[in-house]
Amino acid sequence: MRITHTFRLGIGAAAIALAASACGGSDSATVDGHARDGELTIGIKFDQPGLSVRGQDGSFRGYDVEVAKYVAGKLGVPPERITFKEAPSAQRETMIMNGEVDFIVATYSITDGRKEKVDFAGPYFVAGQALLVRMSDTDITGVESLNSDRKLCSVKGSTAVQNIKDNHAEYIQLLELDTYSQCVDKLRDGSVDAVTTDDIILAGFAGLAPEELKLVGETFSLEKYGIGLKKGDRETREKINDAIERMIADGSWQRAFEETIGPLGGSTLTPPVIDRY
């Protein structure tokens, strides 16, 4: 078959168009590309009082929600163009690596192990692991007072669980569930004796039931909350870091805390220093 000059030009044009389309698709699949398209999918928790809760009307409220909306705004995406997706603790890295979310703002502690799979901007908050018990319990005063007769509940895939396994497993019965609200339900019905996770999370649950629940003891870990995103996306990580610093500097960070966690009994900490690794 004789290939004409016109046919060759047609093949060349099609190849160029296909390459351009591929490049555009690749760019639009990035966080920056999604932001330029005016929309983002952000992973959060759905059941953490004061931090991130989905209301009966489908709206979302809480400190992590406010941080997520502020960061999205600095990336050019308004609140109404954000899709919030539930991000259970044990699934967060997978959701980021699979592209199910653009980034995650979900009391997500920065650890070296997690940084092998995903990147983190921040921290935007620093918390500490604590214990939540029933108001009537006077025997548990801290992690050191737990023993093999006591049942402790926390969430699969959390740093709280790992800390217990690494440092206290020999004398604690540990129940691992999917969410902290499930653990709190077990605490309230007497199935477990305590719930452990970060103090800011527990303060939210205690604030909803101050006659039934209380925090006890000193914190026994340091948890730096970061915004998790796909590994290697340095440009987006730096943009999010800039947004967090701006949120702290313009007072929005403090206001968000006071309007969400503050009323539930949380006490704010000194604003964290961003780790630009």
Q: Residue locations for each model-derived region?
A:
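A ligand-binding cleft/hinge motif common to bilobed small-molecule-binding domains
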Residues: 91, 107-117, 163-166, 188-222
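Acidic, polar ligand-binding/catalytic clefts
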Residues: 82-145
